[in-house]
Amino acid sequence: GGRVLPGSAATADVLPEIADAVGDRVKILVDGGIRSGTDIFRALALGADAVMICRPFLISYYSGGTEGIVTYVEKLRAELTDAMYMCGARCLSDITRGMVREAR
């Protein structure tokens, strides 16, 4: 996990540029750094078609078995739903880049 090269750009920093370059010709799957429902929201807003999550699921499983995974999924769902509600997105396809902005 993590970026391979020190000083490499974070996924979220380059995602909009990649999404603009490929348009609808390629599905964009984002992996790395996705830990919360708000991370999912941000990735979708910046141009991802889907996100992939592994490490948090493994941690959830090792610490709580199947129940740990269920709890983690419920947390992701609640956070994503809250972010969508606060930004006026009724469904995933309503999420747009204009709903997030770069922190300075």
Placement of each model-derived feature along the sequence:
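Glycine-rich, proline-tolerant flexible connector loops at the mouths of alpha/beta enzymes
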Residues: 1-8, 57-62
